[in-house]
Amino acid sequence: SVGFKAGVKDYKLTYYTPDYKTKDTDILAAFRVTPQPGVPPEEAGAAVAAESSTGTWTTVWTDGLTSLDRYKGRCYHIEPVAGEESQFIAYVAYPLDLFEEGSVTNMFTSIVGNVFGFKALRALRLEDLRIPNAYVKTFQGPPHGIQVERDKLNKYGRPLLGCTIKPKLGLSAKNYGRAVYECLRGGLDFTKDDENVNSQPFMRWRDRFLFCAEALYKAQAETGEIKGHYLNATAGTCEEMIKRAVFARELGVPIVMHDYLTGGFTANTTLSHYCRDNGLLLHIHRAMHAVIDRQKNHGMHFRVLAKALRLSGGDHIHSGTVVGKLEGEREITLGFVDLLRDDFVEKDRSRGIYFTQDWVSLPGVLPVASGGIHVWHMPALTEIFGDDSVLQFGGGTLGHPWGNAPGAVANRVALEACVQARNEGRDLASEGNQIIREASKWSPELAAACEVWKE
């Protein structure tokens, strides 16, 4: 018969290939699929593979002009999710040629661009991605990474301390700079612009940058330590963002910041390249992440957004606090914290890691613990996150009854006490409260903080 066989056909005939052996160059994805009633899981998994690669809803004449076998995504394995009715993990392999080099934007457009609205699925969640070495190598990654940051700041053997300046909206630039100075003077390493501080009528960006730089240099001179303030360069256009980064560089400050999900991956990668070329560290805030990652059965898990950020580039990224959450959360969070920091991470389903990931020497990212934490959490945070992290106490610094500087002192004393105790071989998990209590005996600032935030 001449021509091709027209008409609608089942996806699973072409896109479900259980015998497929995955290649080292394939991008692998693990999707949590919830098919509509009556749709078999193979068909649902194949539909995801098809719609996120070469497929369309019907056979087309132009299929004959290319090699589908070379370019199609393949659903190569399906497993039911324990304890969930009609929910499956579908594993899909994508050939590397489907993706533009060095573009997280294109990677996401391909993998999650279209399929999430698909009729045959009730819900769909991307749980994890395996980025092959060949693709990792097309990205610059973090502007500097953990080791270079430590060298630039001359701070070793402990987590770094930060603080978000509150009230986040409404302060004038001069008062804002004063708050920054107090915190840094008290002993913090960093202070931070809030994610929604960009350039508003009450405080234009240029004024803020100037007063923060002044605060930074004053605190640096008085403490003999290198200080930083994450100047938020996020803006309405890439050009404006780079303009702000350029001004930060001219002021000689060490670090700028970006909201990478609201700003977008294209903007983020642009800024990241600028930061490496100009010696700026880049702090990444994850505003909007919960819109994407909060639903358990639809959207994308944060570990995927974290991996994408490491490719796109950032030196710090917010990654939850673990403290006070559920036990399961702890393992899962530590899973993606390792994915951010380590060079090689083994597959471990108990930690939510679906694939072994080799980062082939791409620099690591420091996880930032931020939100609702205070001095009593310090032992747990030190133990859970280890040295390579940034601990950010917003209210936990500024809420101190005596003011910002004493609040900063309290946090620094608590941290140094925990690090010393750990280095002496004490167990932070069981002796944490006692360690803080002992330290507060010779630090009135810490004692006052302990009083305000009861264990």
From Swiss-Prot:
GO molecular function, one term: magnesium ion binding
Modified positions (N6-carboxylysine) in chain numbering: 192
Modified residues (N6,N6,N6-trimethyllysine): 5
Domain of life: Eukaryota
Active-site feature positions: 166, 285
InterPro entries: RuBisCO (IPR033966), RuBisCo_large_chain_AS (IPR020878), RuBisCO_lsu_C (IPR000685), RuBisCO_lsu_C_sf (IPR036376), RuBisCO_lsu_fd_N (IPR017443), RuBisCO_lsu_N_sf (IPR036422), RuBisCO_lsuI (IPR020888)
GO biological process: photorespiration; reductive pentose-phosphate cycle
EC annotation from Swiss-Prot or TrEMBL: 4.1.1.39
Compartments reported by the entry: Plastid, Chloroplast
Reactions catalysed: 2 (2R)-3-phosphoglycerate + 2 H(+) = D-ribulose 1,5-bisphosphate + CO2 + H2O; D-ribulose 1,5-bisphosphate + O2 = 2-phosphoglycolate + (2R)-3-phosphoglycerate + 2 H(+)
One protein family per Pfam: RuBisCO_large_N
GO cellular component, one term: chloroplast
Annotated residues for binding of substrate: 114, 164, 168, 286, 318, 370
Cofactor: record remark: Binds 1 Mg(2+) ion per subunit.
Residues binding Mg(2+), per UniProt: 192, 194-195
Enzyme class of the recorded protein, top EC level: lyase
SUPFAM superfamilies cross-referenced by the UniProt entry: RuBisCo, C-terminal domain (SSF51649), RuBisCO, large subunit, small (N-terminal) domain (SSF54966)
Main subcellular location of this protein, as a coarse class: plastid
Family: Belongs to the RuBisCO large chain family. Type I subfamily.
Biological role: RuBisCO catalyzes two reactions: the carboxylation of D-ribulose 1,5-bisphosphate, the primary event in carbon dioxide fixation, as well as the oxidative fragmentation of the pentose substrate in the photorespiration process. Both reactions occur simultaneously and in competition at the same active site.
Subunit and interaction comment: Heterohexadecamer of 8 large chains and 8 small chains; disulfide-linked. The disulfide link is formed within the large subunit homodimers.
NCBIfam families noted in UniProt: PRK04208.1
Additional facts recorded: The basic functional RuBisCO is composed of a large chain homodimer in a 'head-to-tail' conformation. In form I RuBisCO this homodimer is arranged in a barrel-like tetramer with the small subunits forming a tetrameric 'cap' on each end of the 'barrel'.
HAMAP family: RuBisCO_L_type1
Protein name: Ribulose bisphosphate carboxylase large chain
Naturally occurring in which organism (per UniProt): Lupinus arboreus (Tree lupine)
